[in-house]
Amino acid sequence: DMFDKLVFVSHWQQQQFNTLLKIPYDRGVVIKNAIDPIPKHEETETKDLQLIYASTPQRGLDVLMDALDLIDRTDFHLHVFSSYKLYGWEQNDEAYKHLFEKCESDSRVTNHSTVSYDELRKHWTNMHILAYPCTWQETSCRVAMEAMSAHCAVVTSNWGALPETCGEFAYMYNYTEDKNKHVEIFADALEDVMDSYWTKDVQKNLDNALEYSHTHYGWDKRINQWIDFLDNLIYELDHGENSKKEIPFNKES
């Protein structure tokens, strides 16, 4: 045995390891990712909705930019934060140069490339919708967590662990491998949310999503889960695997 425990960031991820690699469930534990929730802030109704894409380009930026071609309206502005520079792999951006150029050529879009985390957090307080037509099997999704904590509507696919991360709060559609269909489906889903964003029902849903994110995805809760898990693991290693200290790690409340 090369490990005592595997820590997974979602139940979906643990299930994949069990199904594909036959890792027994009792050899793992789920401790989800965490964020520093965006501070609560006042939001007033505005004419133009502020949309955000904040991920590396291969995760769906192409679908998003093609979807904009189908959206014939100007009452929004998209802010794109996308580059491999964040990881020191600037050369990888070359393959997506055409997407960045498309961003630059659309007056409805601002390409911010890479900014500091503190600057991005400031931008979150001005955003309304996370436009994320995800084409990547996320094992978890911190940007969705941050979006919910910032009172943003999350428009995304049900690919990977996104349903688990977003709960019932995202405006989610069924993923498709057909890119052309994906573009059309996402454009429709995004416009539906844009049309209804300021309605009472949507605002109530965003209020609930914010509270959920602040409650379940903050570091205060996650640190305690890690401490409990490590205390349990150390005790088991010291006293044998059949000895378990009564520490309720991975608790959900």
Predicted regions and their residues:
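Donor nucleotide-sugar binding/catalytic pocket of nucleotide-sugar-dependent glycosyltransferases
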Residues: 2-19, 23-40
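Conserved donor-binding/catalytic core segment of Leloir-type glycosyltransferases
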Residues: 7, 43-60, 65-68, 78-79
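A charged, aromatic-enriched C-terminal amphipathic alpha-helix characteristic of glycosyltransferases
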Residues: 177, 199-235
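Short hydrophobic beta-strand element within catalytic cores of glycosyltransferases
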Residues: 153-156, 163
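Nucleotide-activated donor-binding/catalytic signature segment of Leloir-type glycosyltransferases, i.e.
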Residues: 93-115
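Acidic donor-binding loop of glycosyltransferase active sites
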Residues: 125-139, 152
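Glycosyltransferase donor-sugar binding loop
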Residues: 77-96, 113
